[in-house]
Amino acid sequence: MNNVIDGKALANEILSELKHEVQRLKDKTGESPKLAIVLVGDNPASIIYVKNKIKHANKIGIDTLLLNLPITIKTEDLIAKISELNLDQNVSGIIVQLPLPNSIDKNKILSAISPSKDVDGFHPLNVGYLHSGIDNGFVPCTALGCLEVIKKHEPNLSGKNAIIVGRSNIVGKPLSALLLKENCSVTICHSKSQNLSSITSKADIVVAAIGSPLKLTSGYFKPDAIVIDVGINRIGGNKIVGDVDFENVKSKVKYITPVPGGIGPMTIAFLLKNTVQAFKIYS
């Protein structure tokens, strides 16, 4: 049995459904969803991510608008640009590509996006909805992608012991809320957690999202664990690896996602799913 989860194939299923839905919406309304992407500066990794998002959006019929702004832009000027996008009736969703330069107040920027267009799910109102168990807002795309992969391979999550290694607002915290809603027992670990392997080795599900290349070796997992690797780390020049020592772990566990080709494609699929949802709400 092949236990390596093909995130690209799962994402393509979602994108195929979305393509049909976008066409139906276009036939019905005469309009297409539109995703505005704000990119500040010229971080090479960010440019690659943005190009990827635009490519997949256009492939399924979602229009895109890229605002590439200078690294010198001030917080208040960036907020003004976002306010224009909030008012633009042709724009369904808005994302700001992270990370932002240190000179910009990230929290002010994310809070400036209209919650109804916040398809990344980072606005405080949407965060509040998620952690209150209210289904009104948008949920961060990587967390949604992780949950979808987990549920595809373990449909009944009730009572499962899930460990998330990483407490970011992008993955760790939102995914903990989603797994709690599925009645998992959830533990969040982080850089200050002690005896990490003794915690993770008891878990049914382990999500690694710490940004530390190949950190979690086979001793961190029990044999029937589901391992979701969210890490994207560049080593030795151009090689991309996850937070899990994939080659030595894959033969031990029940299921594992690779890097690349695991959660990355799912993140884009759910970003575009959120964008279509925003369009439907608005129209």
Curated annotation (Swiss-Prot):
Q: Which GO terms describe its biological process?
A: L-histidine biosynthetic process; methionine biosynthetic process; purine nucleotide biosynthetic process; tetrahydrofolate interconversion
Catalytic activity field: (6R)-5,10-methylene-5,6,7,8-tetrahydrofolate + NADP(+) = (6R)-5,10-methenyltetrahydrofolate + NADPH; (6R)-5,10-methenyltetrahydrofolate + H2O = (6R)-10-formyltetrahydrofolate + H(+)
Q: Which pathway is this protein engaged in?
A: One-carbon metabolism; tetrahydrofolate interconversion
- Look up the record and report any one GO term of the cellular component aspect: cytosol
Q: Which Pfam families match?
A: THF_DHG_CYH (PF00763), THF_DHG_CYH_C (PF02882)
PROSITE patterns from the xrefs?
A: THF_DHG_CYH_1 (PS00766), THF_DHG_CYH_2 (PS00767)
The record's keywords, sorted A to Z, are:
Amino-acid biosynthesis, Histidine biosynthesis, Hydrolase, Methionine biosynthesis, Multifunctional enzyme, NADP, One-carbon metabolism, Oxidoreductase, Purine biosynthesis
Tell me which domain of life the UniProt entry assigns to the organism this sequence originates from.
Bacteria
Residues recorded as binding NADP(+), renumbered to this chain, are G166, R167, S168, S191, I232
Q: Which family does it belong to?
A: Belongs to the tetrahydrofolate dehydrogenase/cyclohydrolase family.
Q: What does this protein do?
A: Catalyzes the oxidation of 5,10-methylenetetrahydrofolate to 5,10-methenyltetrahydrofolate and then the hydrolysis of 5,10-methenyltetrahydrofolate to 10-formyltetrahydrofolate.
The protein's matches in HAMAP family, at most eight in alphabetical order, are given as: THF_DHG_CYH
Q: What is this protein called?
A: Bifunctional protein FolD
Organism of derivation: Rickettsia bellii (strain RML369-C)
